[in-house]
Design a protein with these regions (language model features):
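Conserved, structured C-terminal
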Residues: 1-133
Length: 133
């Protein structure tokens, strides 16, 4: 994950042993980008999540990682270039699969979302072609 920032040609540095141990372990949660499939409430009002909303399975079961932490929306915002409302969240590996359908609870209603990206790749211009042109 951070290997590109670490110079392993140096004989030793503070934290090297801990980093090498952690590097080989599977992560408890993966940063994911979610897109809101339908943000219309049961009363017909368009709702836009802001962050801190719980994320659940389609069966409304809470999503919990290997350390017992629940998955929540960490940040949210409108993506005009994509025409969607986008959410960020840390999800356990078994849910961090592109195309996975999940539910976000917001103001007492449940909204369908889809895992669009698992990892730190952006949704818009993932290869930086637009900025490099």
């Amino acid at each position: 994950l951070f290997d590109r920032f670490i110079d392993f040609s140096k004989p030793d540095f503070v934290g090297r042993e801990a980093y090498l141990r952690k590097r080989d372990q599977a992560p408890a949660a993966i940063l994911c980008t979610l897109t809101v499939d339908d943000n219309t409430s049961t009363s017909g009002v368009k709702r836009y999540m802001l962050g801190r909303e719980p994320i659940m399975t389609p069966d409304l079961d809470p999503i919990v990682d290997a350390h017992g932490r629940r998955s929540f929306v960490t940040s949210a915002g409108s993506a005009p270039s994509l025409g969607k409302h986008v959410l960020m969240s840390y999800l356990p590996p078994e849910h961090a699969i592109e195309g996975t359908k999940l539910i976000v609870e917001y103001l007492g209603d449940h909204y369908p979302v889809t895992v669009a990206v698992a990892g730190a790749t952006p949704l818009f211009d993932p290869k930086n072609e637009r900025i490099l042109s």
